[in-house]
Amino acid sequence: MVNTQNQISQTSELDYIVNQPYKYGFKTSVESEQFPRGISEDIVRLISKKKDEPEYLLNFRLKAYKKWKKMSSPSWAHIKHPNIDFNTIIYYAVPKLKKELKSLDEVDPEILDTFNKLGISLNEQKRISNVAVDAVFDSVSIATTFKKELSEAGVIFCSISEAIRDYPELIKKYLGTVVPAGDNYFAALNSAVFSDGSFCYIPPNTVCPLELSTYFRINNEESGQFERTLIIADRGSKVSYLEGCTAPQFDTNQLHAAIVELVALEGAEIKYSTVQNWYAGNKEGKGGIYNFVTKRGLCSGNNSKISWTQVETGSAITWKYPSCILAGENSQGEFYSVALTNNYQEADTGTKMIHIGNNTKSRIISKGISAGRSKNSYRGLVKVGPQSFNSRNYSQCDSLLIGQSSQANTFPYIQVQNPTSKVEHEASTSKISEDQIFYFLQRGINLEESIALMISGFCKDVFNELPMEFATEADRLLSLKLEGTVG
């Protein structure tokens, strides 16, 4: 009887730990300029005109819009959500600005205060670590820090709107080459209506002197966010990039449909890390962000490398598969992921590793943590082409269940068309057991700390791949999510 009471007590406390409010759910009161609801060719033209874009980019948008109109929303993922009414969404919403911003002094103090509350200081004198930040608020980039310091090394880091204006040769050459306008339903939508995002170019034989980071904030309840990121690492260069994101707490759902394109030329290396903490909805599953993202990297040069690392804790729905196309000989692709779902969250995420060149290597480490009534699925494709000789892949997919009602799924797809190649895949599903909790409690460690330690150990292979400045933050984010500070 005593044992049963202890089990009930532990279960109740565990439920309390994983069902706490979202820390970043505040809304910023700021006057905004926005287009009418709904999507049409007129809206696409308005966005392009508002941004004073060249004709080739308008044509790119219109082509994408026409393709999107002929496509259907994907239904194969292991997620369920109401049909999205795309005509109720505002596709362009920006804080009202009297003029083009020349310095942070001209940014609305409310917006600066928002990023300060999020721990993202846009004041270069107040930086804590070696990080340059591009801050995106709804449909516009508010500020990019340390541009002068980066430019001295030849590095271009700015909003994609600035890049379209100031570096048209690079945009024409690379935009849409990794993720074509009609790649998938949400990529086509983004290609038609994207408003801002980040652009980065690392010149040959240059190691970027700062970590680069973009922070995305959705503030408007009725608007979606459709940013686009393009990173080009020229031959022999290296760059590390981190993105983070949050949103206010609304009872309705907002749509986030982004594209990230990475291009690594000969001998170049790109490390792209994400800490995703969009609002996930309340414990009854009401509200939250629908997160439909296309991320893909192209190792076009020999001896190039792209590494994706992601920590996913937010969003009501997550649908994203950061991928690598290994075209160059001896190129490498890596994917390290922690995805934590809770309450009624649903995540269908994973990666694709496409081996084309000889002697290519890929590594996949995926950790899924499911709590409450959530569903957490890993979906991965490893494809070895017929001309990809001596290629190698290793995949490890581990799932951890917390509670009685959560789900974990693994959907691996493996296609090998070359007999000289080697592919390994292993998967496991485990549960935090009463014996494990009892072991910690007997040593004076409370339930919250016990679970945090077990989660940290479970995720260490991924956290070790994050940039040093953010590994501790990611560990803390998961702990806080389970302790009750970040719901």
Curated annotation (Swiss-Prot):
It holds the Pfam family SufBD_N. Keywords: Chloroplast, Plastid. SUPFAM superfamilies: Stabilizer of iron transporter SufD. GO terms for biological process: iron-sulfur cluster assembly. GO terms for cellular component: chloroplast. InterPro entries: Fe-S_cluster_assembly_SufBD (IPR055346), SUF_FeS_clus_asmbl_SufB (IPR010231), SUF_FeS_clus_asmbl_SufBD_core (IPR000825), SUF_FeS_clus_asmbl_SufBD_sf (IPR037284), SufBD_N (IPR045595). Its main location: plastid. It is found in: Plastid, Chloroplast. Belongs to the iron-sulfur cluster assembly SufBD family. This is Iron-sulfur cluster assembly SufBD family protein ycf24. The gene is ycf24.
